[in-house]
Amino acid sequence: MHKLVLIRHGESTWNLENRFTGWTDVDLTPTGIEQAKNAGRLLKAEGYEFDLAYTSVLKRATRTLWHCLDEMDRTWLPVEHSWRLNERHYGALQGLNKADMAKQYGDAQVLVWRRSYDTPPPALETTDPRSERGDLRYAGLQAGEVPLTECLKDTVARVLPYWNESIAPAIRSGKRVLIAAHGNSIRALVKYLDNISDQDIVGLNIPNGIPLVYELDADLKPLRHYYLGDAEAAAKAAAAVASQGKA
């Protein structure tokens, strides 16, 4: 049996301000830092060890991973960064307040933008200063690979090749893997692992900073999954994420 641990980054400054974040590179709040440290303490207390970690190229995830590993005294672990683990791109919504958008467009429309599988938000213009095209961290990508908006289906399409080509082979070889990523890149992985339908994925919310453990068989099919720590607290945190897009 293999174990895989997924952690959504701790609370970010734009989580606190209830803004759509996407690929915008915002930092952790003090609460987010403490969430990341607590995840590390929890993993250490439960006896978890890792051989390899993966994260995105956005600082809220990379710093979550660092704080987590620091608490475990494992900052020396090899870490692989990939843009494919970035948060879903929220297009022209990036930087805008979710509740304000719900007041303007209605809760139902914002829910579609936030949680539907195949409906992206309005795209950024290529000339919009919020666009990441031209950002040095994406210099090795083709222009079309740096999105102007994404739906979850698009996020799945970039996450799964990375899973199949890098992460899954590492797990099969016996590596104990930790992934620190984002709400929607984790939703993309969970959708794939648990074979969640396009309709049911709308109801899945990932809380900040709580380790999600998957026990996988030899074919990397899930045997079970669970959040470490207080299950009721994890459920409340997920419910709080769900309510962010309401007026």
From Swiss-Prot:
Enzyme class: isomerase
Name used for this protein in its record: 2,3-bisphosphoglycerate-dependent phosphoglycerate mutase
Any one biological process term the GO annotation gives: glycolytic process
Pathway: Carbohydrate degradation; glycolysis; pyruvate from D-glyceraldehyde 3-phosphate: step 3/5
Binding site for substrate: 8-15, 21-22, 60, 87-90, 98, 114-115, 183-184
Annotated function: Catalyzes the interconversion of 2-phosphoglycerate and 3-phosphoglycerate.
TM regions (residue ranges): none
Gene3D superfamilies: Phosphoglycerate mutase-like
Family under the similarity heading: Belongs to the phosphoglycerate mutase family. BPG-dependent PGAM subfamily.
Assembly: Homodimer.
Domain of life: Bacteria
InterPro entries: His_Pase_superF_clade-1, His_PPase_superfam, PG/BPGM_mutase_AS, Phosphogly_mut1
HAMAP family named among the record's database cross-references: PGAM_GpmA (MF_01039)
EC number: 5.4.2.11
Residues flagged as site, Transition state stabilizer: H182
Gene name for this UniProt entry: gpmA
NCBIfam families hit by this protein: pgm_1 (TIGR01258), PRK14115.1 (NF010713)
Catalytic activity: (2R)-2-phosphoglycerate = (2R)-3-phosphoglycerate
A GO term, aspect molecular function: phosphoglycerate mutase activity
Active site, UniProt feature: H9 (tele-phosphohistidine intermediate), E87 (proton donor/acceptor)
Organism: Acidovorax ebreus (strain TPSY)
Keywords, in A-Z order: Gluconeogenesis, Glycolysis, Isomerase
